[in-house]
Every structure is written in structure tokens, then in C-alpha cells.
């Protein structure tokens, strides 16, 4: 609950901002007051861009990354290596890997991890689409770039079991601590993790 000093409309803005990741009570209050008092034009610009994005952004038919087109920039790039497929949890992982400049293949974004307690199973992660992509393309290596959490280990094991035995499966590892999230790794650690990936 927000403080009674705020009107219902201000409280609604604060509560909406609190739903964002890493935004707590104080941060949501600060952001709401800044946007409404100091920079209403910024608030309107943010609202308009979000409305436009939610109406026009969809998931790439291949990798499941967010895009305005049916096929994202990476999947449509003919200079990328079609024989390598890196499986990641989120677009934030893709950004980290791309910024490190360590990989030139294609991706598949799970948008989560298998977590029965949270009601997330293989169907929620679109693993049927992943299986079809692997079957349709001449992929010779699948790289599992999944965080080494309990859910990540479960997800990696499930995926490795569903991939044909004639396809090489590797897992990034060294330098990624158990429980660590890929998106927070520095570029050197990420580079080392890719270069020292192990076969499954």
C-alpha cells in the first residue's frame, strides 16, 4: 500500500511502477513524482512508446526474441552461422553475448526456465518450436547458455535429452557461478565461459 498522502491517481502510478523488476517502494515513489511533477512530457513520451510497442512488438517466429517483424534481425542475417544454435533464457542474455562479440550463430530464447512450482513447463518455453527448428535446420552444435540455477539445470537436462544424438551439445560453464545469472557476467567471464564450454 502507498502512503495516504498520495491521491488515488498518484498511488496508481506508484503501484504500477512497483510491478517492474528491481523497483521497490521508494524508487517507485521517486519515479512517479519525477514523471508527474518535473517531467510530464517524459511521462507522456514513455506512455506513448509503450502503447506503440505493445501494439506492434511480437516474438520472432524462429528464435522467440522480441521484434517488430515476423523474423528478427539476427535470424534474418545471412552472415550468421546457421549451423550453431545458442539456447538462452532471455533477451538480456542475448544482449550480453552480442555485446561481448563472442558468438556469430543463431539463438533460441526460452523466455524462462522449467519451474513446476511456478507452473512453467516445456510447453510454456515453446520447446516444440525449438525441436522443429533443430529438425529443419542443418545444426551441428547446440550451445546451452543457461544459468546454473536449480531450474536452469533442470531445463538444460530436459533440452539435452530431447535433442538428436548426432548433434553436438555443449554447455558454457567455467566462470559462471552456481545460481549466477548470465546477463550479469562481465564480458571477459562470458568469453571464457564460451571458450571453455564442455560437451554433454
Curated annotation (Swiss-Prot):
GO BP annotations listed: DNA recombination; DNA repair
CDD domains: TOPRIM_recR
GO molecular-function terms, A-Z: DNA binding; zinc ion binding
The keyword DNA repair is assigned to this record: yes
Highest taxon of the lineage: Bacteria
NCBIfam families attached to this UniProt entry: recR (TIGR00615)
Family label: Belongs to the RecR family.
Name listed for the protein in its UniProt record: Recombination protein RecR
Amino acid at each position: 500500500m502507498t502512503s495516504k498522502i498520495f491521491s488515488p491517481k498518484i498511488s496508481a502510478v506508484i503501484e504500477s511502477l512497483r510491478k517492474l523488476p528491481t523497483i521497490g517502494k521508494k524508487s517507485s515513489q521517486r519515479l512517479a513524482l519525477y514523471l508527474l511533477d518535473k517531467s510530464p512530457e517524459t511521462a507522456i513520451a514513455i506512455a506513448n512508446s509503450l502503447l506503440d510497442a505493445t501494439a506492434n512488438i511480437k516474438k520472432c517466429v524462429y528464435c522467440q526474441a522480441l521484434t517488430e517483424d515476423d523474423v528478427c534481425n539476427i535470424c534474418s542475417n545471412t552472415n550468421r552461422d546457421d549451423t550453431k544454435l545458442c539456447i538462452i533464457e532471455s533477451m538480456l542474455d542475448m544482449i550480453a553475448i552480442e555485446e561481448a562479440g563472442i558468438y556469430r550463430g543463431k539463438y533460441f530464447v526460452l523466455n524462462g526456465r522449467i519451474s513446476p512450482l511456478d507452473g512453467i513447463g516445456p510447453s510454456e518455453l515453446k520447446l516444440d518450436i525449438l525441436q522443429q527448428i533443430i529438425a529443419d535446420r542443418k545444426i551441428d552444435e547446440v550451445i546451452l547458455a543457461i544459468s546454473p540455477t536449480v531450474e536452469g539445470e533442470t531445463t538444460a537436462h530436459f533440452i539435452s535429452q530431447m535433442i538428436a544424438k548426432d548433434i553436438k551439445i555443449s554447455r558454457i560453464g567455467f566462470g559462471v557461478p552456481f545460481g549466477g545469472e548470465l546477463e550479469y557476467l562481465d564480458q571477459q567471464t562470458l568469453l571464457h565461459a564460451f571458450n571453455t564450454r564442455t560437451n554433454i
